[in-house]
Curated annotation (Swiss-Prot):
Complex formation: Homodimer.
Annotated function: Binds to DNA and alters its conformation. May be involved in regulation of gene expression, nucleoid organization and DNA protection.
Keyword Repeat annotated: no
InterPro entries listed in its UniProt record: YbaB-like_sf, YbaB/EbfC
Organism the protein comes from: Geobacillus thermodenitrificans (strain NG80-2)
UniProt KW DNA-binding keyword: yes
Protein name in the entry: Nucleoid-associated protein GTNG_0017
């Protein structure tokens, strides 16, 4: 009976190692993906990667008004938040297969 238990344990460990490798690969793929967040009808665009690093900020010239810097700041903030929300959605889609059935707050 002990022997069967050890075999099951080894099988479970192998499955966990396989899952760990697959998760690592998915995280590497996630880092290579990019998303765009926009605000003001595309007047401000923020590009982020899957690790929530901002890679680029694009601002259309016509939105730059020296007399209304606050509006530009709001658009940049909104576009950044939109990009980060999309990264979260992408991470949930990609990593969700590994966390299905697990209810761990803050994990993807």
């Amino acid at each position: 009976m002990m022997r069967g238990g050890m075999g099951n344990m080894q099988k479970m460990l192998k499955q966990m190692q396989k899952m760990q490798k697959e998760m690592q690969k998915a995280q590497e793929e996630l880092a290579e993906k990019t998303v765009e967040g926009t605000a003001g009808g595309g007047m401000v665009t923020v590009v982020a990667n899957g690790h929530k690093q901002i890679l680029e900020v694009k601002i259309k010239e016509e939105v730059v008004d020296p007399d209304d810097i606050e509006m530009l700041q709001d658009l940049i903030l909104a576009a950044t938040n939109d990009a980060l929300k999309k990264v979260d959605e992408l991470a949930n889609d990609m990593m969700g297969q590994f966390t299905k059935g697990l209810n761990i707050p803050g994990l993807f």
